[in-house]
Amino acid sequence: IQNPDPAVYQLRDSKSSDKSVCLFTDFDSQTNVSQSKDSDVYITDKTVLDMRSMDFKSNSAVAWSNKSDFACANAFNNSIIPEDTFFPSPESSCDVKLVEKSFETDTNLNFQNLSVIGFRILLLKVAGFNLLMTLRLWSS
């Protein structure tokens, strides 16, 4: 995804209606995410995800509260939220089962991980062989 628009997602606990979490993603680095004046709302500091493969940095912040009337629009009210920020409707919910169906692994990343593991095993074998040959040479 190249240059995604800022978005705010609200996740509610399916068992308890008074637990809610807001995720504010892909906002500009100049946006100031400050603590809420409400003592029941907790906001994390801004986190930066550096995606070097796409030359893109993604900023995100999380807010949560145990209040039943907690709304994402009010959580970041001290921050300068861009006008084009996407707020999903309250009826829409995040379903883990739908995410699992659409999740695909990156084959290039899997190949790189396997290559690194293979090179480590090869390095250990070479180091072990050199150590054994050195000890054998010293013993004779």
From Swiss-Prot:
Which domain of life does the UniProt lineage start with?
Eukaryota
Magnesium as UniProt keyword: no
Q: Which UniProt keywords apply?
A: Adaptive immunity, Cell membrane, Disulfide bond, Glycoprotein, Immunity, Membrane, Receptor, T cell receptor, Transmembrane, Transmembrane helix
Q: Which GO annotations describe the biological process of this protein? A: adaptive immune response; alpha-beta T cell activation; response to bacterium; T cell receptor signaling pathway
Compartments, record wording: Cell membrane
User: Which InterPro entries has this protein been placed in?
Assistant: Ig-like_dom_sf, Ig-like_fold, TCR_alpha_C
Keyword Transmembrane carried by entry:
yes
Q: Which Pfam families match?
A: DUF1968
Per UniProt, residues of the Ig-like C1-type domain are: 19-107
Membrane topology, Cytoplasmic segments? 139-140
Regions that span the bilayer: 116-138
Q: List the disulfide bonds.
A: C22-C72
In terms of Gene3D superfamilies, this protein maps to: Immunoglobulins (2.60.40.10)
User: What are the start and end residues of every segment in region (Connecting peptide)?
Assistant: 94-115
GO cellular component, as recorded: alpha-beta T cell receptor complex; plasma membrane
Per its UniProt record, what CDD domains does this chain match?
A: IgC_TCR_alpha
Major location (coarse)? membrane
Glycosylation: which residues? N32, N66, N77, N113
Protein role: Constant region of T cell receptor (TR) alpha chain. Alpha-beta T cell receptors are antigen specific receptors which are essential to the immune response and are present on the cell surface of T lymphocytes. Recognize peptide-major histocompatibility (MH) (pMH) complexes that are displayed by antigen presenting cells (APC), a prerequisite for efficient T cell adaptive immunity against pathogens.
Q: How does it assemble?
A: Alpha-beta TR is a heterodimer composed of an alpha and beta chain; disulfide-linked. The alpha-beta TR is associated with the transmembrane signaling CD3 coreceptor proteins to form the TR-CD3 (TcR or TCR). The assembly of alpha-beta TR heterodimers with CD3 occurs in the endoplasmic reticulum where a single alpha-beta TR heterodimer associates with one CD3D-CD3E heterodimer, one CD3G-CD3E heterodimer and one CD247 homodimer forming a stable octameric structure. CD3D-CD3E and CD3G-CD3E heterodimers preferentially associate with TR alpha and TR beta chains, respectively.
| Recorded domain comment | The connecting peptide (CP) domain contributes to the TR-CD3 assembly and signal transduction.
Give the disease association.
Immunodeficiency 7: A primary immunodeficiency disorder manifesting with recurrent respiratory infections, candidiasis, diarrhea, and failure to thrive. Patients show a clear predisposition to herpes viral infections, and features of immune dysregulation, including hypereosinophilia, vitiligo, and alopecia areata. Other features include lymphadenopathy and hepatosplenomegaly. CD3+ T-cells express TCR-gamma/delta, but little or no TCR-alpha/beta.
Q: How is this protein named in the record?
A: T cell receptor alpha chain constant
